[in-house]
Structures are given as structure tokens and as C-alpha cells.
């Protein structure tokens, strides 16, 4: 685990390297803010292994402003999907 300031600095460094080197990065995180800040796409996985629930394209330019309305709009949209409760049909066995 990292303290908050170190985490933010490392995220900025990752973006700098990505822009400088033009490389592909795959980042796995449970932090939605981090995903929106670093990602070009955010993939929300289902609780079933290997199942994709939704793919979001992040269309903000880099560097991103974590305080912008667009950043919060995209984060909130993903947050709602991430914590969406799936309705289960009522089933029973005799």
C-alpha cells in the first residue's frame, strides 16, 4: 500500500512514461478514480471469472484533471455500474 501523495505521483509518472514511450499498458485496479485517470478504456468485470460486464471508453485528453466535471461524470457512471446490484430471479428446489 502507498500513501496518497506517493500514489498520485506514481500515477503521473506512469502517464509520462506512456506518453514518452508509446507503449501498451494493462493496469488492474479496484480504484475507479485510478482507472479513469490512467485508462483509455475501463473494463468492469463481472463477479463470474472472465466475464466482462461493461467497457467504457475514456475520451478525456491526457493529462486529466481529477477535479473536472467530465472526470467526475465518467467516474460516477462507472461507479454506478461497479456497485450495481443484479436482480436474481426467485428460485427454489423441492
Feature locations, PLM:
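Short coil-to-helix N-cap segments within the nucleotide-binding domains
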Residues: 1-2, 6
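Helical segment within the ABC ATPase nucleotide-binding domain
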Residues: 7-21
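Short proline/glycine- and basic residue-enriched helix-capping loop/turn segments at helix->loop/beta transitions
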Residues: 11, 75-81
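Conserved H-loop
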Residues: 22-28
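The feature captures the ABC ATPase H-loop/switch
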Residues: 31-33
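Conserved catalytic segment of ABC-fold P-loop ATPases
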Residues: 37-44
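Conserved beta-strand-loop-alpha-helix hinge in the C-terminal portion
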Residues: 47-77
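ABC-family P-loop ATPase nucleotide-binding domain
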Residues: 88-94
